[in-house]
Amino acid sequence: MVYVGAPSKSHSANNYFSHGMAFGGGGVTLSFPLTAALARTLDVCIERYPRLYGSDDRLHACITELGVPLSREYGFHQWDIRGNAHGILAAHPIAPFISIHHVEFVDPIYPGLNSLESLELFTKAMKTEPMSFLQRSVCYDKKQKLTLDISLGYVVQVYPSVLLPPELERSERTYIAFKRMSQRTEFDFDTKEIQKSMCKKPVLFFLKDVWKDGNITRGSYIRSSERDDLKRKVFCFRSPPLSDIDEIQVSASPLSKRWHLAPRRLCSAVKGYVNDTLFMFVRQCGRGAFGSAFDSLD
């Protein structure tokens, strides 16, 4: 018997309901044997829990009676957040993306688009290559001392310094919790403060379009219109990273059908420049590859 899902992103919500409950908005998956057992016991079971709120709460109680724990799947997302979801989307866990809930409370996902247009592009990217959608890849430009952090189907972040993967894994708190709290302890996952220093902030390239080219998925990421090149040059004593680049084109090869059984962050490399466009390639790490930091910096 298997009970699959994920708790809320909000620590308060998990404390109130349960850290071991699959929240219904993010999605719940039950194995056939568990479903069959519930079919025999559910009607009587829910009578014992009249004070519980919501079908997911009652379902969790009855599954607990059967002695089945939650198998947490990190691709289910009961967001329970408000504001700018950038920090979560840019730092998706290494797991297949499955669902999100409460998108009505967050800002449009992509700059320059309204909420509906953003969700249409988001869905297009997801359907074009579901397995690798929002998967991360980190590589480095050793000569310019840059970090390129890709979240497929969403954004490419170019940092003006070398940042190692453990720091990049943490989600930047660009959002607040559903109950409008923003402190670190309110979130049930690893977070970090918003980078306030202009000289350390990344330059962002957001997805503009995505398409298939044979079995390769290609995405066009356009430089954010919020440019502060002059300020960076004056106050940081250097030009912003990739100041001559307006577009990054990312080509991604398909993942194996068994990737999710032993997931690993993807590998990537810069392929070259043509005029104002940077070309990158993302793929599943091959045998003997030790990761971007080892391969690029040592």
Model-derived regions: residue spans:
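A recurrent flexible, glycine/aromatic-enriched loop bordering the glycosyltransferase active site
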Residues: 15-29, 92-94
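Alpha-helix capping and helix-loop boundary segments enriched in small/acidic/polar residues
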Residues: 21-26, 47-54
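C-terminal catalytic/acceptor-binding lobe
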Residues: 51, 57, 62-298
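Conserved nucleotide-sugar donor-binding
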Residues: 23-42
